[in-house]
């Protein structure tokens, strides 16, 4: 068995950005997530609310664990009672379908 | 023994903001930290760099632990290879001397 870290499909230089029609469809599947743009790069993000800092940090760690599993990493903003998760694909400077799959996994982790 | 969560001295409504003279002195003691302002609220922040996501998240957890200990919480932005720590005192909408003490503790954690 190889012990190489699996490469993330969304992080390949030839990975395809989600096209506008699919973007709309995918966004409708994660209604709590909003589309944003930073320096021309499209991203999706959601704020998750918690009762205290410890629960927020626990969620950050859970999302960190799925990120490590897939080797695709979000930005995680942890504060007292809140975690903002933002997904995008650095290499293609935009959104890959994996970003939406990861958003769905975040929903599953939060609702578990 | 009381099991009440200790209140953070910087989070009392009558806590004092650091005055401009002290601000300059305190900033010089944490030269890696920069002063910033969001919506009129002064904050201090530093980007810490790491070799991967796991090490970044580990640092986030270490800073989270000292935050819980003091019951004063920063904003922690965790990404692949980077953690941005930002301290300020929400209640007084600015910087308390405790924010600088916490910045120093972050330095100690990072350099340990």
UniProtKB/Swiss-Prot annotation, chains A, B:
GO biological process per UniProt: tetrahydrobiopterin biosynthetic process
| Keyword check for tRNA processing | no
Please give the Gene Ontology molecular function terms for this protein: 4-alpha-hydroxytetrahydrobiopterin dehydratase activity
User: Which terms are listed as keywords in the entry?
Assistant: Lyase
- Reaction equation(s) it catalyzes: (4aS,6R)-4a-hydroxy-L-erythro-5,6,7,8-tetrahydrobiopterin = (6R)-L-erythro-6,7-dihydrobiopterin + H2O
Q: Identify the EC number(s).
A: 4.2.1.96
Top-rank lineage group of the source organism: Bacteria
UniProt lists the family membership as follows:
Belongs to the pterin-4-alpha-carbinolamine dehydratase family.
Kindly give the NCBIfam families that the UniProt entry links to this protein. Answer: PRK00823.1-1
Protein name per UniProt? Putative pterin-4-alpha-carbinolamine dehydratase
Instruction: Tell me which species this is from.
Output: Hahella chejuensis (strain KCTC 2396)
